[in-house]
Design a protein with these regions (language model features):
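Catalytic machinery of carbohydrate-active enzymes
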Residues: 1-386
């Protein structure tokens, strides 16, 4: 039975002592799921014997599958179901899949359901789940708080990083939040695949700069020719190997970037590895240069230094979390605007290749061997800001 705001009751605060089972509702996207991993770890450390399940959509589910802190991952295939219901002959099969999913969702009576997502799609599933207490936050949108069992908690969304916002949930429950690492679990199968990839591309023992140039929002994109020029400078002036990462849908754009390069030494991995292999890959890279997108958060979670190019979004809310990262952005009155469409894109166009390359040199200076710093960095520095 779903609960609505008219049925909110004034109740005592949720206590750790009353929790034996938890459902986390965080459906997507990749970066948001990565940001929720610290909360998962903290809940498990404070409730070692509790059942903890996670409701997630298919696209980002690979990130959390096999996580030691989880008892079960419940996967919603919402996008596929919607596609099959529009102009498809698979309506009957799809309906059976949905019913099976709902049966799985409702198979457990949870002591606590936490809607971390805060949109209508998560609110509806929170309402459909069986839970004694259902909590969420005031920053939620689209009426999702109507499905909670009690008034939402107030949190200041704008001034806090997403990881810190989500950890406030654990604070509210009385958890000790001092210890977590937020890493994505990878196993030997993922590492062995990377071993084969590194042998194939002669990457073992090489210093590697990964570049992830794509993003879902058009306003987050940097111009392809700038990535081409940046990659050329990394190859020519720093003597590093360059790896491009992205999904199979990014393949045409990455091919365009590679065609725009003077050199042929870059490796295009678009569509060749999954999210777990990507996480393992970033542990072997010296740096990732990226737009504001999911792989940026994966790299940060795996302790790979990140140089992030920001335009329409706010790095203090969703930037790479932790030490050792660098955000490059233009200080404009219109940024952050959080718009997915823009006629001028001044915030991204204002970021020059030289500025990114200079940030890369400073990043590498901290960890580079002396001979590389002298042989590469000093020669490169003469042209760094062009």
């Amino acid at each position: 039975m779903m609960q609505f705001s008219g049925f909110w009751k004034k109740r005592s605060p949720v206590s750790l002592s009353e929790i034996r089972s938890i459902l986390i509702v965080k459906l997507s996207a990749i970066g948001d799921v990565v940001h929720t991993l610290p909360l998962l770890e903290v809940l498990r450390k404070n409730l070692p014997d509790a059942r903890i399940d996670w409701l997630i959509e298919e696209e980002a589910s690979e990130i959390i599958k096999g996580h030691a802190a989880l008892n079960r991952v419940i996967v919603s295939r919402r996008k596929l179901w919607q596609k099959n219901f529009v102009g498809s002959g698979r309506k009957s099969t799809t309906l059976k899949e949905i019913m099976s999913f709902l049966k799985e969702l409702r198979s457990e009576q949870y002591d606590l359901v936490i809607d971390i997502h805060g949109l209508f799609k998560s609110g509806l599933l929170t309402g459909l789940a069986r839970g004694r207490r259902k909590i969420g936050f005031t920053w939620a949108r689209e009426g999702s708080t109507l499905f909670l069992s009690e008034p939402p908690f107030f949190e200041d969304q704008y001034r806090q990083h997403a990881i810190e916002r989500y950890l406030k949930t654990a604070n509210i429950l009385g958890c000790d939040v001092a210890s977590w690492n937020g890493r994505i679990p990878v196993d030997d199968s993922h590492r062995k695949m990377l071993d084969r990839l590194f042998r194939k591309n002669d990457l073992n023992g090489k210093r590697i700069a990964a570049i992830n140039p794509m993003a879902k929002w058009d306003t987050k994109l940097w111009e392809p020719d700038r990535f081409s020029r940046l990659a050329d400078r990394i190859l020519e002036e720093l003597g590093m190997r360059v790896l491009f990462t992205g999904s199979r849908h990014d393949q045409p754009a990455l091919q365009e970037i590679c065609r725009g390069m003077r050199n042929e030494g870059a490796v295009n991995l678009a569509g060749q590895i999954g999210l777990k292999e990507l996480a393992a890959l970033y542990t072997r890279c010296d740096v990732l240069i990226t737009t504001d997108t999911g792989p940026m958060h994966i790299a940060a979670a795996m302790n790979c230094p990140v140089i992030a190019l920001f335009g329409p979004t706010a790095p203090w809310r969703t930037g790479p979390y932790g030490n050792g990262h660098k955000v490059i952005r233009e200080d404009l009155g219109c940024s952050p605007c959080f718009k997915k469409a823009c006629s001028h894109k001044t915030c991204m166009k204002g970021i020059t290749v030289g500025r990114v390359f200079y940030a890369l040199m400073k990043q590498l200076d901290h960890k580079a061997p002396e001979k590389i710093r002298i042989a590469g960095h000093r020669r490169a520095s003469l042209r760094a800001l062009r």
